[in-house]
Amino acid sequence: YLRGTYAQLGALSATVSLVFEQSYGSLEGDSAGLAELLAVLSAISGLPLRQDLAVTGAVDQTGRVLAVGRVAEKVEGFFRVCQTLGLTGTQGVVLPKANLPHLTLRREVVEAVEEGVFHLFAVEEVDEAVELLFGRRAYWVHEKVREALEHFQKLENGEEK
């Protein structure tokens, strides 16, 4: 995804390695892919991410957000954390839209969503998640990432100090 989105700059002057563990404890799969990608964009750009949203979803090379397993457990787990810390009305979970048809949640979570005190944001593309987590239009965030990568490139070439 990074190469496809930012390759017009030439060779990327940053090396990013993401390892998607396929099994960790009782959870399996690449469901942290979207969250990890957002963290990388934040690290490169220096832009902060919202801290009141949990994120789950796999990502393909074109930026599509793919379905993952055990979404109900993840949503309900984050809901319990938010409930314990105090619901603010802004908290929620970003999840793949493809998971919605089969998502079954406990009644208290459904009620919190219906009351607007907890939110579910179903996304199909990385840019939708970018806008939710950065609070800015995706094109603007991508421009900040490009600027940072161009700066890295100039540093690497000795053009800037």
Predicted regions and their residues:
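Peripheral, non-AAA+ core regions of ATP-driven protein-machinery
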Residues: 1-161
